[in-house]
Amino acid sequence: DIDLISVMFNKKSLSHFQGPESLKNRRVAWIKGYDFHPYFDDSITVFEIANRKSLLRMLKKDRIDYYLDARVDMDFAKDEYHPNDESLIVRDLLSLKLYPAFSDTKKGKALTKIWDQRMGKIKDTKKMKDLFAQWGFEYPFP
């Protein structure tokens, strides 16, 4: 599966936006604790903000140029705080692969073993493929 990372910016910047390169030498913000650093070079000025409401306020007041977040969270925040605001533009920026993670404990290792065994049995079944199709997701296994 993937985590779709999107960027939000003010409409006045739309003509200048050319994807990830557009973030260079700009003020870019995301939720505190997220780690988008590995996907961008050091030319961006990063602001880590505690909540999405503040991120949107900063964007509206031109205190940041771009706001990065998971698409689903960004859409929710826009619908919650600025539902009819056409001055905020959202574009998809990155697709990050998702992997299950288990804690490095005895219980976590047991869960990892169960996950690996059961996924090995069900991943190529018709039932699994039907489940992905039912919810409109692309089947991720070759």
What are these regions (language model features)?
Residues 1-6, 79-119, 138-142:
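Periplasmic-binding protein-like
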Residues 1-23, 33-36, 90-93:
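Acidic, polar ligand-binding/catalytic clefts
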Residues 11-17, 24-27, 101-135:
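Extended ligand-binding regions for polar small-molecule ligands
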Residues 22, 38-39, 57-58:
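Well-formed, non-transmembrane alpha-helical positions, independent of function
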Residues 34-50, 86, 119-142:
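Ligand-binding clefts/hinges and TM-proximal coupling segments of bilobed small-molecule sensing domains
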Residues 28-29, 46, 67:
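Short, well-ordered beta-strand core segments
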Residues 53-73, 80-81:
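Short helices/loops that flank or line small-molecule/ion binding pockets
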